[in-house]
């Protein structure tokens, strides 16, 4: 009979007082229902909002604001508790995909594998912490809180370069490369693209884009956005009429990827 991975033998572990916001949202990605439900229950009892996914592909949808899993939530989860061995998209590939898209959400990886190599690979791929099964629920909660504190207290940094697939944008230099070929963009085109690249997959309405780029005092038409998106597509898309970077979300606005 398989032992319960949520071993409660760590009675001597010091209980860490709550430090993270009770509104913090945690995504639990685990294919074993017993473990998934138990982890979700423990975190909910600690005051967190919890979403669950049984595989990596479903979990990735929580980072797309137009997906059914994300619902009405427009922000990414604050933390991901991620099993290493998952169907569809495994834990390592999940980390790679998120980090490649510029998503910096803290990730706590869970695994029955306990070799140094496994831990190092997980951390180098993009996980922020690694917890070996079986584990105590107190340690799980303590590690979640530590990761949330670290991410909430970390000052926002302006990266030297923003990357999305073949695009590279240098904020300080106002330069954009597409497949290492430099592009010539107007100031508004540059700021639009920078906003999209800082928030990949987030859907922006025309009004939101106008306020962010043109300012709240702008008195023009929202079709200004459509015109600038068309110009951007002509510069970054292989086929502007069938874009792969700047996508239209019908009835709402635009997103990158």
Swiss-Prot record:
The keyword Transferase does not apply. Keywords: Activator, DNA-binding, Phosphate transport, Phosphoprotein, Transcription, Transcription regulation, Transport, Two-component regulatory system. Residues 25-148 form the Response regulatory domain. Residues 159-257 bind DNA. The modification 4-aspartylphosphate is found at residue 83. GO terms for cellular component: cytosol; protein-DNA complex. One of its GO terms (biological process) is regulation of DNA-templated transcription. Phosphorylated by SphS. GO terms for molecular function: phosphorelay response regulator activity; transcription cis-regulatory region binding. SUPFAM superfamilies: C-terminal effector domain of the bipartite response regulators (SSF46894), CheY-like (SSF52172). Member of the two-component regulatory system SphR/SphS. Response regulator. Involved in inducible production of alkaline phosphatase in response to phosphate limitation as it is directly involved in the regulation of phoA transcription in response to phosphate limitation. Binds to two distinct sites upstream from the phoA promoter. This is Alkaline phosphatase synthesis transcriptional regulatory protein SphR. The gene is sphR.
């Amino acid at each position: 009979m398989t032992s319960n991975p949520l071993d409660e033998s760590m009675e001597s572990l010091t209980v860490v007082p709550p430090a993270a916001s009770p509104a913090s949202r945690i995504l639990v990605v685990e294919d074993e229902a017993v473990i998934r439900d138990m982890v979700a229950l423990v975190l909910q009892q600690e005051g967190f909002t919890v979403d669950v996914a049984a595989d990596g592909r479903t979990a990735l949808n929580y980072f797309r604001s137009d997906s059914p899993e994300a619902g009405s939530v427009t922000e990414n989860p604050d933390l991901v508790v991620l099993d290493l061995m998952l169907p569809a998209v495994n834990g390592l590939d999940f980390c790679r995909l998120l980090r490649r898209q510029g998503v910096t959400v803290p990730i706590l990886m869970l695994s029955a594998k306990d070799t140094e190599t496994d831990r190092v690979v997980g951390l180098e791929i993009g996980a922020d912490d690694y917890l070996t099964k079986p584990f105590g629920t107190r340690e799980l909660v303590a590690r979640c809180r530590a990761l949330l504190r670290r991410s909430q207290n970390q000052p926002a940094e302006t990266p030297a370069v923003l990357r999305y697939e073949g695009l590279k944008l240098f904020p300080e230099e106002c330069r954009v490369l597409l497949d290492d070929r430099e592009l010539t963009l107007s100031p508004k085109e540059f700021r639009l693209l920078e906003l999209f690249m800082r928030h990949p997959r987030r859907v922006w309405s025309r009004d939101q884009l106008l306020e962010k780029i043109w300012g709240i005092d702008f008195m023009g038409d929202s079709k200004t956005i459509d015109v600038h998106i068309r110009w951007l597509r002509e510069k970054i898309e292989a086929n502007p009429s069938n874009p792969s970077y700047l996508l239209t979300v019908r009835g709402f606005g635009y997103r990158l990827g």
